[in-house]
């Protein structure tokens, strides 16, 4: 009876199983079934579970991303209904879940946190990116959709994934349109580096992570001329410790853009890296 009471208070059915020598597997909430179906479902009443600890809403998205599962309808509706409560959760706890989500095999699941209203509370700048179009031949979708693709295109490293999350964070603020109606985002890397610093501080990241991410955001669009002298100057200006991470950032950014001149852009990064390594 005590075990059942304990399991009832767990967050999701897949986490509400126990095993002992006498009875074997105790699975009162069909956790095995949900594992087989690939479903994240709350134990009992979802509104109650999320009211007990609002961080569980972000944990649901994180588990879905890590396991490649979907979030069951009632559980997802409860998140949408209670999303505002995540503001009661400490920044440190949100940071831990966000990093696990971003470094998972399916970081694009961040879109579920957007759709359910979670990012509106702890990362409102992301919502603005999702709602900012890019009328430009280099792009085929909103700043936010491009960002999600870029996160997925970079290796699952904390600094790299945070950099891709924030690399275009200032595009909405820097957006201008020329006479032909083409959008431009002049100065967005430098402004973005400042915005990224504010966001990462707000989420209580350590100074080393903040510095590394902000430098990569600051220089992600810097394209030196392909001569030995110019590349050496760039490495000196940007800082040798930003390499070779900067090349991973550049490639992910290109792969998340439209196909316009993609081969040419990738060839440039290859040549830049070759010169850096020489």
PLM region spans:
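Catalytic cores of the polymerase beta-like nucleotidyltransferase superfamily
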Residues: 1-278
